[in-house]
Amino acid sequence: MDPVEEVLNNPATRAYIHRLIGDEGINLLERFPKDGEHSDEDLAASTGINLNSVRHTLYTLYEKRLAEYHRIKNNETGWLTYLWQLRIDLLYDAIREDMETVLSKLERRARFEEENDFYICKDCHDIYTFTVAMGGNFTCPNCGQPLSHFENETLAKALRARIEIMKKTLGHA
């Protein structure tokens, strides 16, 4: 089976790709010629997809290292032509990199939740750290109502559970 077809037939990897490049990008991948390198103009012409959409998709894939190009300069005009090829074989590396980024953000958020006390306005539902609440004499800066202690243990536990699942998935001990 073709690597692109294999990726697009898997619901999880298809969803990841779709989040990156949308419907038109998926359409381009489905129609991308199997072999060789192709200019963005040739891809637009052969697939019937708008040139700007083709370029946007290719640049987005390039940012994740899922497409690569090399340039050829026309010596007469000085114009550059970019010849593209897909690197779908690097998809799992891109997913792993994104998961590592999310894991790092979740860990920072969990630390923030665990290291702070929070107060909530029962009317506005805005939440403030202890420092901010104390600075406003435990009254809501928006509506003047008194702030109540907000128990964030459920959120902190949920973050820690998600972090553990991601660590196991990524092979972290």
From Swiss-Prot:
Gene3D superfamilies listed in its UniProt record: Winged helix-like DNA-binding domain superfamily/Winged helix DNA-binding domain
Stored PROSITE patterns: HTH_TFE_IIE (PS51344)
Keywords assigned by UniProt, alphabetized: DNA-binding, Transcription, Transcription regulation
Recorded superkingdom: Archaea
Transmembrane spans: none
Family: Belongs to the TFE family.
Record's subunit section: Monomer. Interaction with RNA polymerase subunits RpoF and RpoE is necessary for Tfe stimulatory transcription activity. Able to interact with Tbp and RNA polymerase in the absence of DNA promoter. Interacts both with the preinitiation and elongation complexes.
Cited function: Transcription factor that plays a role in the activation of archaeal genes transcribed by RNA polymerase. Facilitates transcription initiation by enhancing TATA-box recognition by TATA-box-binding protein (Tbp), and transcription factor B (Tfb) and RNA polymerase recruitment. Not absolutely required for transcription in vitro, but particularly important in cases where Tbp or Tfb function is not optimal. It dynamically alters the nucleic acid-binding properties of RNA polymerases by stabilizing the initiation complex and destabilizing elongation complexes.
Protein name: Transcription factor E
